[in-house]
Amino acid sequence: MFDQTTNTEVHQLTVGKIETANGTIKPQLLRDAVKRAVTNFFSQLDGQEASEVYEMVLSEVEAPLLDIIMQHTRGNQTRAANMLGINRGTLRKKLKKYGMN
């Protein structure tokens, strides 16, 4: 499972605010998209039990997030870590987890 840092990051991203140079953005659209995707996932289970849904959702959000941020920063891990609000070591660990190193 993910550590507490990841839980905090996802919580801030989905229910908090994102600080930018031009102000604060509330990511309601992201929250709504995740809610629709999870609802769709459960509707397709056809009565089967799901397991490890938390891990699945986090990895499905985290992997593309890391990919896009690394593209945005042109591979600059220090900038990417700062944008994510995590330290560079944590970023490197996450990139390795998803084979993005």
Swiss-Prot record:
Molecular function in Gene Ontology: DNA-binding transcription factor activity; sequence-specific DNA binding
Entry's Gene3D superfamilies?
Homeodomain-like
Spell out where the chain crosses the membrane.
none
Ranges in coiled-coil conformation: none
Keyword annotations from UniProtKB, A to Z: Activator, DNA-binding, Transcription, Transcription regulation
Q: Does the keyword Transcription apply?
A: yes
Q: Which InterPro entries match?
A: Fis_DNA-bd (IPR005412), Homeodomain-like_sf (IPR009057), HTH_Fis (IPR002197), Trans_regulatory_Fis (IPR050207)
Q: Which residues bind DNA?
A: 77-96
Pfam families named in the record: HTH_8
Q: Does the keyword DNA-binding apply?
A: yes
Source organism, top-level taxon: Bacteria
Quaternary structure, per UniProt, is: Homodimer.
Q: Which HAMAP family match?
A: DNA_binding_Fis
The similarity annotation says: Belongs to the transcriptional regulatory Fis family.
* Listed PANTHER family: DNA-BINDING PROTEIN FIS
* Function in brief: Activates ribosomal RNA transcription. Plays a direct role in upstream activation of rRNA promoters.
Q: Which protein, by its recorded name, is this? A: DNA-binding protein Fis
Give the species this sequence originates from: Shewanella denitrificans (strain OS217 / ATCC BAA-1090 / DSM 15013)
Q: What is the lineage of its organism?
A: Bacteria, Pseudomonadati, Pseudomonadota, Gammaproteobacteria, Alteromonadales
